[in-house]
Amino acid sequence: MLKNPFKKKSIADKYQTLIREINALESTVKTLTDGELRNKTNQLKQRYQDEQNLNNLIVESFALTREASYRTLGLRHFDVQLIGGLVLNGGKIAEMRTGEGKTLVATLPAYLNALTKKGVHIVTVNEYLASRDQTSMGQIYRFLGLETGLIQEKMTTPERQRNYKADITYVTNNELGFDYLRDNLALNIRDVFLRPFNYCIVDEVDSVLIDEALTPLIIANSVKTCVDKYIIASEITDYLELNVHFEIDEKNKSVLLTNQGTIQIEKILGVQDLYNPRDPWIPYVINAIRASSLFFRDVHYIVQNNRIVIVDEFTGRIMPDRRWRHGLHQAVEAKENVAIRQTTEITASITYQNFFLVYPKLSGMTGTAKTAEVEFDKIYSLPVEEIPTARPNLRQDLPDLIYKDEFSKWNAIAKECQNISLVKQPILIGTTTVEKSEMLAQLLQEYRLSHQILNAKPENVRRESEIVAQAGKKGSITIATNMAGRGTDIILGGNIQFKVRKDLYNILVTYKYQTKENKKDSLSRSLQIFPLLKKLQRTSQKFLTVLNCLINNKQFLNLSDVEVLKILNESELIRVPKISYQCSMKFLINELVNFEKKTQKLDNVIVKNLGGLYIIGTERNDSQRIDNQLRGRCGRQGDPGKSRFFLSVEDKLIRLFGDARLENVLKSQLLDDLPLESELVTKILDSAQKRVEERNYELRKNLFDYDDILNKQRNVVYYERRKVLESESARIKILAYGEQVISEITSKLRRKKVFGSQLISRIRNLLGTKFLLNFPSSDLNNLESIDFQTYLLQEFWLSYESKILELEVEYPGIIQEFERTLILIYMDREWKEHLQKMSLLRDAVGWRKYGQRNPLSEYKEDAYKLFKYRGIVTRHLVIYELLRSSIL
């Protein structure tokens, strides 16, 4: 039978040869001892040094990683996971469903690329995931002779440097981006954290490169803030009426004052012009209106410890280090009557779009990338490959139900939970904001339905892993804001490891305190407190013996409760503990797991028979990817599951982006409390969602186009800066600057027809009286411009060298440090000024389209002029400072 030449190759077909070769090598690798397996790493490193070709090492390195994983973690990579590893190594995005083992897949390309000795970064969206993955997967790398690093928020400079020097480093996108910016503000090479970039794997790549693309990373300095104006502007909003004094654009989160509004505000303030540049009120007023009408508590932010903390709309997590720009954050602080912090000016900034493009080799993994593959390809040159599942997907996505209003929708959700809870099927409800999660929790309470809630509130965040892990438990109801980057698998019947760790923690802490207080019969007391111990007394006497020994271990008794909890949490990740009390705790956990297994297996079967986890979405998100992230929480690894979205006509997506067809259908068919289930409505909603996604893509593309211009300039500045930072002496740079400055000064003065003694006087004023100019002024008028420049250059060199010699006698070695630091300080200062100007230019250039001019072309042209001017000013300031400084 002839093959169809037009049939598209499946991903399995693409990598079939390599998979076959890796599998063929498996039996050989299995015969190697642990030492021989470890020695293979050095052999592969040497082969790379000789051949400079990683492709020749793929088969052997993947086979070694698979075997090391089995020996350390008891986990063997499936063939589909090998495919995922090959996709990642090829500089692509691997789309893998929830529960398919992305964390394990990343070990394959990470180990391979670490053989270059240039370092590998594995980027996660939060510290919990980075720490968890480094602890568990680090065992594989260490077994193979590689070092792993972990970057955490409060690490010192030496700790960061040590961890970045590891072969494979786990780090959050936030920490990595800020460390890059800090490196490019360092005044001494000893303070630099990062080595040159090599290879990066981004977990939840769509969250980082798409959802956070519009939010730049910013390092800023505080500047003087007019607090009173923010407070007064906030109070003024109480006297303004929507659509009378101002209009809002909810889609773009913008505000427009009407003429009546302008007059009203000027009257209240007692000023003649809100736009007066000497005493401007307009930015304060606009931000105050935006804060009161478009930014809401427990939706866009929470108030924590008398501070405004932004909530990430895509992940539902708080972002304590982020602040809104251009005075908006201060306006929200004034609205909430909390302390108003100072405004800032940008010192350094970069978007994730441009930051990750610094890597020579980049790849990513996520459960939801296919819907954004055009953007990944056009902006990042990252193709998306869908990885097949190890088992068939049994999830059932039910049609949306749409209700007349929000009241009917929320009541329907509560009733659905009530009905489902009767059969004990677990339910996970996804909400879009903190406010709605709290409101639904209150509603379920009225229905007397027991539930767990996970949102950005600190008291809930602390229990995140446990809440998510137990969402598959029989009869559980869990309310959670968006599920991106939660990182914990939901196991049907409940997660036995989390239950066991919680039970054992309570037992150990109670038992420990009783022992410390020298209470007699602490065991019998514990048996009364914990019924679980009574059951174990009948089945495992060894458990109680080990428990008794542990409680009498002095090292263990000196541990804090937090340290006990940390050891318990890491016990699942560490297969072979090294400390005696860790061994005892590992044994106790294993005993409890074996004891609970029978019950958990039974619950697992029951929940599967009930249909698995039931996902309820309470609103369609702006992006289909976010909806798919929620749906993807059920049906993991061949489990059953179902999902359904409950919607209302008042939902944001329908209200802002629905079209006339949808409105007509809904008005004609919707009745009180009765939902509409229609394929047409679902298609119209999909279409509305697509329009929002296209609009957001255009926003990100537009940002990228503009930011690309600034990024090219940033790359030039950072390259020049690094050369100065790494140089032993900046003397050549100083001399080059001097030549350029003198050339620029003389050319400018001659254009202004300044000659003779007047020329000498002007140059002395500019460069300082110490500048040696002994040339007879009578001869100056007869000199050509180029000859005069040569003379000035010679005098500059002589003046500068004489000062250096004097300084070296008094302060040996200081001049080199001084030269280098001075250049860096002025580079940074002028770059900061340049960023302010570019920001103003970006805001202003948009108006030029009304003059039939292309804003992007205009921006590019003006940006070049500003950048050129920045270079001139930097050179002049450095030379002026060197020649006029008292240190010289």
Curated annotation (Swiss-Prot):
<keyword id="KW-0472">Membrane</keyword>
<protein>
    <recommendedName>
        <fullName>Protein translocase subunit SecA</fullName>
        <ecNumber>7.4.2.8</ecNumber>
    </recommendedName>
</protein>
<keyword id="KW-0793">Thylakoid</keyword>
<dbReference type="Pfam" id="PF07516">
    <property type="entry name" value="SecA_SW"/>
</dbReference>
<dbReference type="InterPro" id="IPR000185">
    <property type="entry name" value="SecA"/>
</dbReference>
<dbReference type="InterPro" id="IPR011115">
    <property type="entry name" value="SecA_DEAD"/>
</dbReference>
<feature type="binding site">
    <location>
        <begin position="99"/>
        <end position="103"/>
    </location>
    <ligand>
        <name>ATP</name>
    </ligand>
</feature>
<dbReference type="Pfam" id="PF07517">
    <property type="entry name" value="SecA_DEAD"/>
</dbReference>
<dbReference type="InterPro" id="IPR011116">
    <property type="entry name" value="SecA_Wing/Scaffold"/>
</dbReference>
<keyword id="KW-0150">Chloroplast</keyword>
<feature type="binding site">
    <location>
        <position position="81"/>
    </location>
    <ligand>
        <name>ATP</name>
    </ligand>
</feature>
<dbReference type="InterPro" id="IPR044722">
    <property type="entry name" value="SecA_SF2_C"/>
</dbReference>
<keyword id="KW-0547">Nucleotide-binding</keyword>
<dbReference type="InterPro" id="IPR027417">
    <property type="entry name" value="P-loop_NTPase"/>
</dbReference>
<dbReference type="InterPro" id="IPR014018">
    <property type="entry name" value="SecA_motor_DEAD"/>
</dbReference>
<keyword id="KW-1278">Translocase</keyword>
<dbReference type="GO" id="GO:0017038">
    <property type="term" value="P:protein import"/>
</dbReference>
<dbReference type="InterPro" id="IPR036266">
    <property type="entry name" value="SecA_Wing/Scaffold_sf"/>
</dbReference>
<keyword id="KW-0813">Transport</keyword>
<keyword id="KW-0067">ATP-binding</keyword>
<keyword id="KW-0653">Protein transport</keyword>
<keyword id="KW-0934">Plastid</keyword>
<dbReference type="InterPro" id="IPR036670">
    <property type="entry name" value="SecA_X-link_sf"/>
</dbReference>
<dbReference type="GO" id="GO:0008564">
    <property type="term" value="F:protein-exporting ATPase activity"/>
</dbReference>
<dbReference type="Pfam" id="PF01043">
    <property type="entry name" value="SecA_PP_bind"/>
</dbReference>
<comment type="similarity">
    <text>Belongs to the SecA family.</text>
</comment>
<dbReference type="InterPro" id="IPR014001">
    <property type="entry name" value="Helicase_ATP-bd"/>
</dbReference>
<dbReference type="GO" id="GO:0009570">
    <property type="term" value="C:chloroplast stroma"/>
</dbReference>
<dbReference type="GO" id="GO:0006605">
    <property type="term" value="P:protein targeting"/>
</dbReference>
<dbReference type="InterPro" id="IPR020937">
    <property type="entry name" value="SecA_CS"/>
</dbReference>
<dbReference type="InterPro" id="IPR011130">
    <property type="entry name" value="SecA_preprotein_X-link_dom"/>
</dbReference>
<feature type="binding site">
    <location>
        <position position="489"/>
    </location>
    <ligand>
        <name>ATP</name>
    </ligand>
</feature>
<dbReference type="GO" id="GO:0009535">
    <property type="term" value="C:chloroplast thylakoid membrane"/>
</dbReference>
<dbReference type="GO" id="GO:0005524">
    <property type="term" value="F:ATP binding"/>
</dbReference>
<comment type="function">
    <text>Has a central role in coupling the hydrolysis of ATP to the transfer of proteins across the thylakoid membrane.</text>
</comment>
<dbReference type="Pfam" id="PF21090">
    <property type="entry name" value="P-loop_SecA"/>
</dbReference>
<keyword id="KW-0811">Translocation</keyword>
<dbReference type="GO" id="GO:0065002">
    <property type="term" value="P:intracellular protein transmembrane transport"/>
</dbReference>
